[in-house]
Design a protein with these regions (language model features):
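Membrane-interface helix/loop caps of multi-pass membrane proteins
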Residues: 1-342, 355-360, 613
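Extracellular/periplasmic envelope-modification machinery, especially enzymes
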Residues: 218, 243, 305-315, 319-326, ...
């Protein structure tokens, strides 16, 4: 059976790539732009299965076609990104890029990012090749389908294979569903894994088999509404599927179902007018190039503009993405795929040489033999600011005492490392210590009622970071409230999370290196540095604080927001450095010793605690 061109598939590809690009550009028409990847996966499962089993492709022919389709554009994008990264990425981010290069050459970048990062974390803005995880995922599916193809070649086996795919699809779908419901806190990075996505590929494969059944194909052609219903399902999913940490989950089935319905509705031209327009078909044809180039372009834009892009800058980035993608499609992707550039032997020789070159680059970069241009600034800044102790955790002493019999208001902070920061800041200020006794217990010991300090306290403060901690459920705070109020009858206070900044390293150090700030220029740059800290705030922290505030209102307890003494929203700054040039954070959100002293003073000056009644 010949694989006839279906323009509505290109229209569907266009919707997929546009939603992904808008999502990465943080153009918030909708919250579920990441579902574009799910649409791509279903399309890929359908197209590859159709090519393999119903077009008499040989295995070698299939492999050559896929390599010609994927690798010329991919390798060019990787080389270009590496060149720009050399000039603009910070040393630590450039070193991480080396690992990405090696992982891409083995088509396992999805596994690398599974271990390295959370897809929803802001640290992804320092990884210009993060989007290649889905290309590795697709190549892994190619390997899977190639093995199946080698085993099931004749018509009889195709019938067996059809039911085999259905069985595997159902098993994987229900397995992922059960896992998501029962173990969702352990599901954070499954987004990257083939095991969590294979059922989506297989649904596309099942459609390819189903459309080979003439009666079903003819019946579906009569259902004019079927295609439009699938498109409606996808559009609805863009608004109702949000960004949970444990995606893919049950909601993934919505866009997958919509994509399946559209593909199933076959080549009924009367029902495809929405996807058959020339604009969407054009975007669909260059969708692979758009996907390849958009992410590194936006990463570098975010990098240049302190992770805070204006709408106009986003438009510029979109235009650059389009024109580079168009050039890449016309002069790289299409000529190589149509065999207009290089015959088989020459083509594979070129691919192997570039592969080896990128692999060597990855080894040199990840081992820091080849260092970024900013490395020289890195060395200079380290020498100019020897007392900053970049990347070193400060030594502290917080005495784990029991409360005394004094008349001071007694405050117990139940917290994690950020709760420790709060206690250290409070204890570092003499005026606060004259009025309050402040002690610390781990959140776990308070929650499990193993702390002996609750009974002797006047106030119990819950101070944990929520996201990224093992106490990542808001319900745990409500559980602690019930313990404190019901069993001990103490006053309970919820403390908001500490501002976190978009970096996996020292943010002040990043600023000094990127701008090559000398020791003499530091004081003059303090306002710019503090604005830089505000520009690099993680967006999700505000949402977490809003949720904590609502919980405090429902429980009728006090809510204290750390933003009140760390940041100022009116003038758009967060303290990252004080007026004497002392650094206040040693990583993405933890105080230095100087920071604890500084914030202790701010807590006192703003009367942040406001606890006057014993």
């Amino acid at each position: 059976m010949k694989l006839t061109y279906r323009p509505e598939i290109d229209g569907l590809r266009a919707i997929a790539v546009l939603t992904v690009i808008f999502y990465h550009a943080k153009i918030n028409f909708f919250k579920g732009g990441f579902i574009g990847v799910d649409i791509f996966i279903v399309i890929s499962g359908y197209v590859i299965t159709k090519l393999f089993f119903f077009n008499n492709y040989s295995l070698s022919n299939f492999i050559e076609k896929r390599i010609r389709r994927l690798f010329p554009g991919l390798l060019l994008m990787i080389l270009t990104t590496t060149l720009f990264s050399y000039f603009f990425l910070l040393p630590i981010h450039f070193m991480n890029l080396g690992q990405s290069l090696m992982a891409n050459m083995f088509s396992i970048s999805n596994f690398l990012f599974f271990y390295q990062t959370n897809y929803w974390d802001s640290a992804v803005l320092t990884k210009p090749l993060l989007h290649t995880w889905s290309i590795s995922l697709e190549i892994q599916f190619y390997i899977f389908i190639s093995i199946i193809f080698a085993l099931f070649r004749n018509y009889f086996f195709k019938i067996i294979l059809f039911f085999f795919f259905i069985s595997i699809f159902l098993i994987l779908f229900f397995d992922n569903t059960v896992f998501e419901i029962n173990f969702r806190e352990f599901n954070l990075n499954n987004y990257f894994l083939i095991f969590a996505r294979l059922w989506e590929f297989l649904l596309g494969s099942i459609i390819a088999f189903a459309l080979n059944i003439k009666k079903l194909d003819n019946y579906l052609k009569k259902l004019n509404f079927f295609h439009n219903f699938g498109l409606l399902v996808i559009l609805i999913s863009l608004f109702i599927v949000q960004t949970p940490l444990n995606y893919p989950n049950l909601s993934t089935f919505i866009p997958v179902l919509g994509s399946a319905i559209i593909i199933l509705s076959s080549n009924n031209q009367n029902s495809h007018f929405l996807l058959n327009n020339s604009f969407l078909i054009h975007i669909g044809k260059i969708s692979y190039s758009l996907y390849l180039w958009h992410f590194p372009i936006f990463i570098f834009f975010f990098y240049f503009f302190d992770f805070n892009l204006s709408f106009l800058n986003k438009v510029y980035a979109l235009l650059i993405t389009y024109f580079i993608s168009l050039i890449s499609y016309k002069f790289v992707e299409l000529p190589f795929y149509k065999k207009k550039l290089l015959q088989k032997k020459s083509f594979f020789l070129l691919i192997i040489l570039v592969y080896v070159f990128i692999l060597i680059l990855g080894v040199l970069i990840s081992s820091q033999i080849l260092k970024s241009k900013l490395h020289f600034n890195y060395v200079k800044i380290k020498n100019d600011f020897p007392n900053y102790n970049f990347f070193q955790i400060p030594k502290r002493i917080v005495l784990d005492n029991q409360f005394t019999n004094s008349d001071k208001i007694k405050i117990l902070v139940c917290g994690d490392s950020h709760g420790f920061d709060l206690v250290y800041a409070l204890q570092s200020n003499s005026e606060i210590k004259n009025k309050y006794e402040i002690e610390l217990s781990s959140f776990g010991s308070c929650l499990n009622e193993t702390s002996l300090k609750i009974d002797k306290s006047d106030y119990v403060l819950s101070s944990i970071q929520i996201e990224g901690s093992r106490y990542n459920k808001f319900e745990d705070i409500e559980k602690l409230y019930k313990i404190v109020k019901t069993k001990y009858n103490k006053k309970f206070i919820i403390v908001g999370v500490t501002p976190e900044f978009k970096t996996d390293s020292d943010l002040l150090f990043n600023y000094l290196v990127q701008n090559n700030i000398s020791k003499e220029d530091l004081i003059n740059n303090i306002p710019s540095i503090n604005r830089y800290f505000h520009n690099n705030l993680k967006f999700n922290i505000t949402n977490i604080n809003k949720k904590l505030f609502l919980i405090s209102k429902n429980l009728n307890v006090i809510f204290l927001n750390k933003f009140d003494y760390i940041c100022n929203e009116e003038v758009k700054f967060c303290y990252g450095i004080d007026q004497e040039g002392k650094k206040l954070f040693f990583d993405y959100s933890h105080y230095t010793n100087d920071g604890a002293i500084f914030f202790g003073k701010k807590i006192y000056e703003t009367d942040w605690l406001k606890l006057n009644l014993k």
